[in-house]
Amino acid sequence: MTKIVSVAEVLQGRTAIGEKVTVRGWVRTRRDSKAGLSFLAVYDGSCFDPIQAIINNDIVNYESEVLRLTTGCSVIVTGTVSKSPAEGQAVELQAETVEVVGWVEDPDTYPMAAKRHSIEYLREVAHLRPRTNIIGAVARVRHCLAQAIHRFFNEQGFYWVATPLITASDTEGAGEMFRVSTLDLENLPRDDKGAVDFSQDFFGKESFLTVSGQLNGETYACALSKVYTFGPTFRAENSNTTRHLAEFWMVEPEVAFATLADNAKLAEDMLKYVFNAVLKERMDDLKFFEKHIDKDVINRLERFVASDFAQIDYTDAIDVLLKSGKKFEFPVSWGIDLSSEHERYLAEEHFKSPVVVKNYPKDIKAFYMRLNEDGKTVAAMDVLAPGIGEIIGGSQREERLDVLDARMAEMGLNPEDYWWYRDLRKYGTVPHSGFGLGFERLIVYVTGLQNIREVIPFPRTPRNANF
């Protein structure tokens, strides 16, 4: 039985010259020479490059099948690993047999024929786009980053916690939540006041898809000390932009006894760890992005990993922006939420490095962020990266029940909706901190792609839930 190997194993020298192996994959291209040879480029997704298989015209199905192979056909090729005289690849496969597993029915209408396609077109055939160089590379980078995140937290002594995707109406920002219901829309039950009677719904109350696992994560941090969630979150924002998805993945660590300074250090360590991992493990894919998407991709990651993070208070950041002499589209004044142009000015022009902005005005931040002694600001932080702006948002959480209750009253929230969250402050409360990282935004940063819809397999956006 011949050893079955991946294309990556052969190209990375993990098989010996002269060894007989079997490779299984799909045809990227076929070239025929006048000397009675065919050259098949076969890929299996295990790495960026396909392997070249050299096929002599004396194999039994050469005329009947090999010469009919087109882009996308699936094949099993058995042959001997040999040194390649051609440039660009150290080894190739001298084929002894080529078994055709699946044909492309009509090569002329195959959506992934070997020409270049626009990114917009590829979204329309999202079920086939993983076969392209660009989306294949994204998928491998996405996997590498996800694995690195899990590895980082595991090495740091964190526990991964699965927080619920379906939550009751006790999460902030209910206006941008997707409702989960099994009620008959043609015949909705009503209460005495004519409002929809959600007590008759599946969960006996209004329920939604989660916008964050943070509050649930805090409950576990207050028992296991260091936890993180990594899963899908949902926002019903009607934003048709290159930066927004209705369904995306979030990484949310939560740490007991941690201050805002600890939180900023954790964010810096995590980002540098995962960027180092992708530089080490996926250089083949990064070189593709560097050549075709953004020539600064690799340099940007290497600079990020080597740089010290700057830190600045929000109030000082406002001063920097006011004194910059730049005319911003959104005017700068104390109390505004920083827009993307402000964030990028700070990271790219002023500090020329990643920067942590901290201690934001309480009126633009969530109720659970710890109130500072000045009574005007909260212990919040954003990590801003050159080239994209905000990449992480987090805070030290409010551990004092009386202050938490006062903040909730200020914001018109019903404390009864948060009874379980308030309990954490009643029974052995501790200072604790955490942050949220939008995973797709991280992948955009790593790949240099301009649109977040390219970095998730099946993007969910307003008016679009195909596949």
UniProtKB/Swiss-Prot annotation:
One of its GO terms (cellular component) is cytoplasm. GO terms for molecular function: asparagine-tRNA ligase activity; ATP binding; nucleic acid binding. Keywords: Aminoacyl-tRNA synthetase, ATP-binding, Cytoplasm, Ligase, Nucleotide-binding, Protein biosynthesis. SUPFAM superfamilies: Class II aaRS and biotin synthetases, Nucleic acid-binding proteins. It catalyses: tRNA(Asn) + L-asparagine + ATP = L-asparaginyl-tRNA(Asn) + AMP + diphosphate + H(+). The keyword Glycoprotein does not apply. It comes from Mannheimia succiniciproducens (strain KCTC 0769BP / MBEL55E). InterPro entries: Aa-tRNA-synt_II (IPR004364), aa-tRNA-synth_II (IPR006195), aa-tRNA-synth_II/BPL/LPL (IPR045864), Asn-tRNA-ligase (IPR004522), Asp/Asn-tRNA-synth_IIb (IPR002312), NA-bd_OB-fold (IPR012340), NA-bd_OB_tRNA (IPR004365). PROSITE patterns: AA_TRNA_LIGASE_II. HAMAP family: Asn_tRNA_synth. It comes from the Bacteria. This is Asparagine--tRNA ligase. Its EC number is 6.1.1.22. One of its GO terms (biological process) is asparaginyl-tRNA aminoacylation. CDD domains: AsxRS_core, EcAsnRS_like_N. Homodimer. It is an enzyme of class 6 (ligase). It is found in: Cytoplasm. Belongs to the class-II aminoacyl-tRNA synthetase family.
